[in-house]
Amino acid sequence: LAEQSPDVKVVILERGKDVLTKVRISGGGRCNVTHAEFLPSELVKNYPRGEKELLGPFHKFMTGDTIGWFEERGVALKIEEDGRMFPTSDTSESIINCFLKEAKEKGIEVKLNHAVQHIEKTEASWIVQTTKGTVIAKNLVVATGSNPKIWQMLQQLGHQLVPPVPSLFTFHNN
């Protein structure tokens, strides 16, 4: 978002004391970044759910784009025999550090320990109450993670949610 719209102020409200904790443990601590499949129609077949929802985004930003994005930022990726792609460093910290550096360069503000308590939509803005105060925003992007309280808040605002299934990352690999 910050890359596409540099004039927009982006604030991340993180419930926890640290960001990207699931990235840290993904792929056994190595962070399985993507899969070496370069056709969107083939890549989506490997997802046990979300095939329809992912096809459009994969046509806009695909495996090659992901590889290029990380390489432009100094993080080389490697392909393993089964097609999974990891940083050549074999540590998720390379990915985390890349994201944090990029966020800092783009002026993204990360507010830790800011658990969302209430979301309200007014005519002109969104009002988000957190454990540490109020944030008012013109636009709101919600990434709920595994927080059922947020799901309930979104439903109260009239959104329909697809029932969540616990997972860090799901990918069929034969």
Question: Predicted segments — roles?
Answer:
Residues 17-19, 24-25, 33-40, 160-162, ...:
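An anion/pyrophosphate-binding glycine-rich loop and adjacent beta-alpha core
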Residues 61-71, 81-106:
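An accessory alpha-helical subdomain
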Residues 7-9, 74, 107, 158:
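A generic structural signal for alpha->beta connector loops
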Residues 19-25, 51, 55-62, 74-85, ...:
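A short alpha-helix-loop-beta-strand transition element characteristic
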Residues 8-10, 77, 140, 161:
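Hydrophobic anchor at the start of a short beta-strand
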Residues 2-28:
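Glycine-rich FAD pyrophosphate-binding loop
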Residues 30-79:
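Glycine-rich active-site loop/strand segments that organize a redox cofactor
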Residues 93-174:
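Predominantly flavin-linked oxidoreductase catalytic cores and closely associated redox partners
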